[in-house]
C-alpha cells in the first residue's frame, strides 16, 4: 500500500470529507488559472507561430486535451473576452464551465452581461432552460459524431423541416431498404465534389496545364494552377513552425502568394502555397507589417457594419 493510500485509510470520516472539499477547491482554482493562461495565449495568438491554426487545435494537438475538453475551454475563454468577470464567478462556484460554454454560443456584445448574470448559481438543466426561453429557435442537442463500431459512427444533429422533406424525397427515389446512412453518405459525396470543384478547381477532365507565367500581382488563380497547388501541398496548410511542426489544418485553406502579391508575386504554381486563415494572416504580417493587417481588419469590420468612409454622408461645402 502506498504512503498516500495509507494516509487516506487512516483518516477520520470528517478529515476525509474536509480533505475532499479542499482538493476540489484547489482543482477549481487551478482550472480557472489555466483558463486565464489560455485567454492570454489567445489574445497574443501565440499558438500561430508554433504551428497551430487555432486555440482549439493547440489545446487538442499541443496540450493533449480531448476535443470536448478543448471545446468547453475555448468557449469559456471567448465568453470571458466579453465578460471578464466570468473567471472570478467560475472560481467562486457561481458559474460552471458547462453552463458558460453553452451560453457562449448565444452571446454578443449586447446580451453577454445579462446572460452571465441570469446564469449565476444555475444548474446545467436550468441554464439549458434559460437558453430555450431566451432563444426559442436554439438547437435541442449538440452536434456530435461518436464511434459506434470500428467502422461505423453515430451522427447526432438537429435539422430543419426542409432537410426532413429532402430526406423523405430521397428515400422515395432510392431503392427500398436503402438506409439513411447510405443516403447521407451519397449526399455528402456530391456536396464535397461540388465544393472541391469550386474551391480547388478539381474536375474529372482537366482542360489545361498550370500556367507557367502570369502577370505580377494578379489576384486570379486559374483552376489548373489551383489543382496543382492543392495536389502538391496535400490539401493541407503548409506552414511549418520554427521547431519543425507543420500545421495540420485542412479547413478553409487559402492560396497565398509567397512573398506577397502586393510585392509582385505571380499566380503560378511555384509562387503559391496553401495556408490556413491564421497562417495566411501571420505571413502577411511578416511581409507587410502589423499595421497593414490591422488596417485591413478594421476596414473589413467597418464594411460589415456600414461604418466605412464609403458609407458616410458627403460634407457640404
Residues of each region from the PLM?
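Amphipathic alpha-helical "recognition" segments
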Residues: 52-125, 133, 148-149, 156, ...
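N-terminal acidic-hydrophobic amphipathic loop/helix motif that frequently occurs adjacent to catalytic
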Residues: 1-63
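A boundary/linker detector
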Residues: 1-12, 18-21, 31-34, 117-317
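DNA major-groove recognition helix of helix-turn-helix
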Residues: 42, 74, 81, 131, ...
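Residue-level recognition of alpha-helical structural elements
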Residues: 16, 30, 48, 96, ...
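Generic alpha-helical segment signature
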Residues: 13, 27, 31, 76-79, ...
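Secondary-structure capping and boundary motifs in well-ordered enzyme cores
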Residues: 26, 30, 47-51, 61-63, ...
